[in-house]
Regions:
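AAA+ P-loop ATPase motor domain of ring mechanoenzymes
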Residues: 1-128
Length: 128
């Protein structure tokens, strides 16, 4: 049965990972590549994903963006989530009896971001 009015839309910034058989003529009406985010865009992505997180006052989003050239928006989102989890884990390890009101002590530091960035960079090296 023919599907009428169905549009399939997909986007990627890793077109190099798509099977060439899918990219042959006639498979898609239109192909376009979404480029990797530039420095300014990476900084904005960090801002979006850290907006409601307890960051150390020393965190410089531009500095983080400089260290993440070649990474995707989803990589940066993962870095922010991982850095937050590292900060939580560190706080809990320091104080096993952490009370709910003590969660205000949690602060995501540059060290947490460095560790998260390194994890993503190592994963990207393994993929390639």
């Amino acid at each position: 049965e023919d599907l009428k009015g169905v549009i399939v839309l997909a986007a990627t910034n890793r077109i190099d990972l798509i099977d060439p058989a899918l990219l042959r003529s006639g498979r898609f009406d239109l192909l376009f590549e979404v480029p990797l985010p530039d420095l300014k865009t990476r900084e904005k992505i960090f801002g979006i994903h850290t907006r409601k997180k307890p960051l150390s006052k020393k965190i410089n989003l531009n500095k983080l963006a400089l260290k993440t050239e070649g990474l995707t928006g989803s990589d940066i989102e993962f870095i922010c989530r991982k850095a937050a989890m590292l900060a939580i884990r560190q706080t809990i390890d320091k104080n096993q009896n952490l009370a709910a009101e003590q969660t205000a002590e949690i602060s995501i530091s540059e060290k947490h971001f460095e560790e998260a960035i390194q994890l993503v960079l190592n994963q990207n090296v393994i993929k390639k």
